[in-house]
Curated annotation (Swiss-Prot):
GO cellular component: cytosol; extracellular space; lysosome; membrane
Domain Saposin A-type: 19-59, 475-515
Protein source organism: Homo sapiens
Function: May activate the lysosomal degradation of sphingolipids.
Propeptide feature: residues: 18-59, 146-180, 259-288, 370-391, 474-521
One GO BP: epithelial cell differentiation involved in prostate gland development
PANTHER family the UniProt entry points to: PROACTIVATOR POLYPEPTIDE-LIKE 1 (PTHR11480:SF39), SAPOSIN-RELATED (PTHR11480)
Pfam hit, one: SapA
Glycosylation site list: 201, 311
Cellular compartment(s): Secreted
Intrachain S-S bonds: 64-140, 67-134, 95-107, 184-254, 187-248, 213-224, 294-366, 297-360, 325-336, 396-469, 399-463, 427-438
Signal peptide: 1-17
Keyword Repeat assigned: yes
Identification of the protein by name: Proactivator polypeptide-like 1
Length: 521
């Protein structure tokens, strides 16, 4: 009895809204009445469809999203000067988003023929009016109808839907021997678990149905199961075809061997942090070749240490690093430039805190027995003459080095995976057939996209754009160590030469120092 009472209002509502007369097709019920505004008007069921079908959740698609946005803007009264003709023209414009000319023309005809019904719907509740209008014009499809009409994907669609990890195109990577890293291991473990379940005749959709859908109740559980079946079939097929390592490698969760060394922070002796370069270590000591040696490092750092006895602020160290190579002997000037260019971030942190010998040990140019080490070729980049001549700023070189490393990191498989995910996110607003084609396009053209990003990350251009590098400029008073005056100029012969103050120091400082020394003697 209770069930009958609950059913009675819906039956009465359907009877009241049902057409009393009309074509024979109207006798087929609401499935036919509510397919669009034209049919509903012909069957006299506009009111019923508006309240029972068109106000329900809709399937996501580009025409539907555009239509609902425009309908919401047209119906919210934000433009009080908009006439009814203006509103109808906006709604008619959305019909152009339909995929075929025939459906677009039919949509425009309905807007023109049933303008009063459309305006009436737009004046309704703001939260339901856009969906009602757009579903009535066939720009949106009710979600329940969309899921009910889905069919399993064909073999051709399945191949495209499983991209990128099933695509045999640009993302076919060389297999690695063993998974490494926490992310890779987690991926392999998860895929192995799913494959074991698949082997026991449980599909991936079944696993999710058991965990997710059963708790939703009988009404939503059917929609949930239908949805999962359609979208997990491609992944289920991939699980049956590929081993775990292959799936995770193709998905970008496992890196290839021989990834480029990266900068790592390590805890140094005496508790001083060292930005040590992640250079490849060998069991035997590197044979010394042309480049930066332990002796060059010691010479440069000792000179810096001597200059900075009274002022060892980070700014002063940075300025000293820019000038130190100009006072080095000509035989090691080139090596000095390489040293400063490669290790300046570490030197700035370390010079003020520890002895020169420890500095050179920290950056691995001096071993325990002070045997010579060579800087790895990948980092031994001599600054171009233009850079030295322009004096572009202390942060310029670091900025360019940072962007160069970032550009190289674009080759990382995990980075490529993240970029692909970002690009494919834009495909999600398209209807399913277009979404598959969009994702396939992104996968096919991934090398071109990555290369374009690398071109946009030109280190010199970007660093100039953000102001890290500037054109030639004369050092201002207070930004140069020579601006400290005689207390710095006359500290040593090298400092006097550096500041062009040899005569001044000889006449006013060193001469007086010799006189005082003679008096005390």
């Amino acid at each position: 009895m209770l069930c009958a009472l609950l059913l009675l209002p819906s039956l009465l509502g359907a009877t009241r809204a049902s057409p009393t007369s009309g074509p024979q097709e109207c006798a087929k019920g609401s499935t036919v009445w509510c397919q669009d505004l034209q049919t509903a008007a012909r069957c006299g069921a506009v009111g019923y469809c508006q309240g029972a079908v068109w106000n329900k959740p809709t399937a996501k698609s580009l025409p539907c999203d555009v239509c609902q946005d425009i309908a919401a803007a047209a119906g919210n009264g934000l433009n009080p000067d908009a006439t009814e003709s203006d509103i109808l023209a906006l709604v008619m414009k959305t019909c152009e988003w339909l995929p075929s000319q025939e459906s677009s023309a039919g949509c425009k005809w309905m807007v023109d023929a049933h303008s009063s019904a459309i305006l009436s719907m737009l004046r309704g509740a703001p939260d339901s009016a856009p969906a009602q209008v757009c579903t009535a014009l066939s720009l949106c499809e009710p979600l329940q109808r969309h899921l009910a009409t889905l069919r399993p994907l064909s073999k051709e669609d399945t191949f495209e839907a499983v991209a990128p990890f099933m695509a045999n195109g640009p993302l076919t990577f060389h297999p690695r021997q063993a998974p490494e890293g926490a992310l890779c291991q987690d991926c392999v473990r998860q895929v192995s678990r799913l494959q074991e379940a698949v082997r026991s005749n449980l599909t991936l959709a079944d696993l999710n149905i058991q965990e997710q859908c059963e708790s939703l109740g009988p009404g939503l559980a059917v929609l949930c199961k239908n949805y999962l079946f359609q979208f997990f079939v491609p992944a289920d097929q991939a699980l049956r075809l590929l081993p775990p390592q292959e799936l995770c490698r193709k998905g970008g969760f496992c890196e290839e061997l021989g990834a480029p060394a990266r900068l790592t922070q390590v805890v140094a002796m005496d508790g001083v942090p060292s930005l040590e370069l992640g250079l490849p270590r060998k069991q035997s000591e590197m044979q010394m070749k042309a480049g930066v040696t332990c002796e060059v490092c010691m010479n440069v750092v000792q000179k810096l240490d001597h200059w900075l006895m009274s002022n060892s602020s980070e700014l002063m160290i940075t300025h000293a690093l820019e000038r130190v190579c100009s006072v080095m002997p000509a035989s090691i000037t080139k090596e000095c430039i390489i040293l400063v260019d490669t290790y300046s971030p570490s030197l700035v942190q370390l010079v003020a805190k520890i002895t020169p010998e420890k500095v050179c040990k920290f950056i691995r140019l001096c071993g325990n027995r002070r045997r010579a080490r060579a800087v790895h070729d990948a980092y031994a980049i001599v600054p171009s003459p233009e850079w030295d001549a322009e004096n572009q700023g202390s942060f310029c070189n670091g900025c360019k080095r940072l962007l160069t490393v970032s550009s190289h990191n674009l080759e990382s498989k995990s980075t490529k995976r993240d970029i692909l995910v970002a690009f494919k996110g834009g495909c999600s607003i398209l209807p399913l057939p277009y979404m598959i084609q969009c994702k396939h396009f992104v996968t096919q053209y991934e090398p071109v996209l990555i290369e374009s990003l690398k071109d946009m990350m030109d280190p010199v251009a970007v660093c100039k754009k953000v102001g890290a590098c500037h054109g030639p400029r004369t050092p201002l008073l207070g930004t140069d160590q020579c601006a400290l005056g005689p207390s710095f100029w006359c500290r040593s012969q090298e400092a006097a030469k550096l500041c062009n103050a040899v005569q001044h120091c000889q006449k006013h400082v060193w001469k007086e120092m010799h006189l005082h020394a003679g008096e005390h003697a």
